[in-house]
């Protein structure tokens, strides 16, 4: 998606790419600082590394949440706009649920990842909005 938008609109493409890079770095820093062990009781798959915050939850919320913002801002057709927003919101929730179901995260890891990403997105969007407005 970022590559396609980079070709069509460089600012939007770069904003998507930088969003993913920043949230991934932030997630890794928080994991190394907090060092919460993963659940050991029930695992369908084996994961390594620390548990909090959930990387999948943080990255999915930051990536799809930012796409939701872009869709809301740029897509004019209300049916398409709201259909995409609902579908992406469901996808974010399903990714979080899957991490708990697979036994690789506690519920608090997923919810914490979502909340950290939402907080990050508020700041990121407020900063990037100024850059995108300079089109």
Regions flagged by a language model, labelled:
Residues 1-50, 66-73, 82-86:
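Hydrophobic alpha-helical bundle signature of multipass membrane enzymes
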Residues 40-135:
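Membrane-embedded catalytic cores of phosphoryl/pyrophosphoryl-handling enzymes
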């Amino acid at each position: 998606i970022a590559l396609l938008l980079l070709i069509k609109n460089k600012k939007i493409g770069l904003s998507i790419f930088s969003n993913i890079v920043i949230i991934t770095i932030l997630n890794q820093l928080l994991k190394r600082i907090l060092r919460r062990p993963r659940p050991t009781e029930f695992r369908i798959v084996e994961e390594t590394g620390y548990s909090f915050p959930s990387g999948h939850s943080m990255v999915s919320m930051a990536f799809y949440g930012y796409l939701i913002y872009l869709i809301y801002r740029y897509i004019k057709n209300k049916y398409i706009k709201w259909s995409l927003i609902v579908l992406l919101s469901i996808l974010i929730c399903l990714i979080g649920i899957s991490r708990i179901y697979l036994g690789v995260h506690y519920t608090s890891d997923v919810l914490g990842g979502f909340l950290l990403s939402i907080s990050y997105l508020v700041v990121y969007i407020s900063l990037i909005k100024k850059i995108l407005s300079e089109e």
